[in-house]
């Protein structure tokens, strides 16, 4: 259980007023104190976060440009999964753990062993795990991108979908968590199967779907462009849909679309929301932009008008 969930439980058990009283009492004891660290300790901490030694490289790579022009799938991966690096001649590569039909964030032991070797060979020995349930190689030389890409393809880790509709965040849900009201992983798997066509996925563009199996919100559903929250209705799995959430600098909590829908309808609902966005969007608009411009009404009408 994370700290956020522990705080929720404390507030529920103690009441908001008592919790506030305890926080203020603790703050009164520490607000005028000073955290004193000797210079040796500060220096030791700083050494733990020292940047790696980068090779001086040009920003451009002939090999990358040639393959980008010759191989559309590489070009698509380059656009979706490779981000700029502050160090010239380097790039940040995200390894998608969201294949079609896969459990979000899942990797086999063989894949993990291989990624460790790739980190040593291409990323100065460093791997990071993103909050979006993917892996990141943060220090890749741009000239090595074609070779790294081919190895990721062979491992099944080169799905070009970072930040797109099939790059779903999901908690373990009812399959693995005693707190959950409904399953999360199978919902994510079904959505990725519905949106298996990468050309369609890229045409849809930036769209973040987040799924939580209960109100503890471990899947961050409340800040998803499309949020999906599992609820229990008389022992049956239902899902409350929210729209318009964001965890970015324009942070917002999603707004409830309407009555919760049963498990068997979730994928159709998501597709209906996406199709509504595609029909209404202006050139260059993301799902979130279109939602903020047109509001909830057209999305609600699409999902509930025939009910």
Predicted segments with their positions:
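Peripheral terminal and linker regions in Fe-S/redox and tRNA-modifying enzymes
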Residues: 4-307
């Amino acid at each position: 259980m994370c700290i956020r969930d522990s705080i929720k439980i404390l507030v529920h058990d103690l009441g908001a007023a008592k919790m506030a009283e305890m926080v203020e009492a603790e703050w009164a004891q520490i607000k005028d104190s000073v955290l004193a660290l000797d210079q040796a300790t500060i220096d030791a901490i700083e050494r733990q976060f020292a940047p790696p030694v980068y090779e001086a490289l040009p920003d451009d790579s002939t090999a990358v440009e040639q393959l980008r022009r010759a191989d559309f799938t590489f070009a698509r991966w380059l656009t979706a999964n490779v981000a700029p690096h502050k160090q010239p001649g380097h790039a940040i590569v995200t390894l998608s753990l969201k294949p079609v039909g896969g459990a979000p964030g899942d990797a086999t032991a063989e894949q993990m062993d291989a990624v460790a070797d790739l980190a040593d060979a291409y990323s100065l020995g460093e791997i990071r795990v993103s909050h979006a349930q993917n892996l990141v190689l943060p220090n890749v030389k741009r000239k090595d991108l074609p070779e790294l890409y081919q190895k990721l393809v062979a491992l099944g880790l080169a799905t070009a979908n970072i930040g797109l509709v099939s790059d779903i965040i999901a908690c373990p849900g009812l399959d693995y968590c005693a707190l959950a009201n409904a399953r999360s992983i199978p919902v994510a798997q079904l959505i990725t199967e519905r949106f298996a066509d990468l050309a369609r996925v890229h045409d849809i563009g930036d769209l973040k779907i987040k799924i939580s199996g209960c109100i503890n919100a471990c899947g961050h559903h409340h800040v998803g462009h499309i949020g999906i929250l599992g609820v229990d209705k008389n022992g049956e799995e239902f899902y409350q849909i929210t729209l318009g959430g964001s965890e970015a600098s324009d942070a917002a909590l999603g707004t409830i679309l309407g009555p919760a829908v049963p498990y068997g309808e979730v994928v159709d609902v998501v597709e209906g929301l996406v199709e509504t966005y595609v029909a209404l969007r202006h050139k260059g608009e993301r799902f979130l932009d279109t939602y903020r411009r047109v509001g909830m009404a057209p999305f609600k009408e699409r999902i509930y008008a025939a009910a």
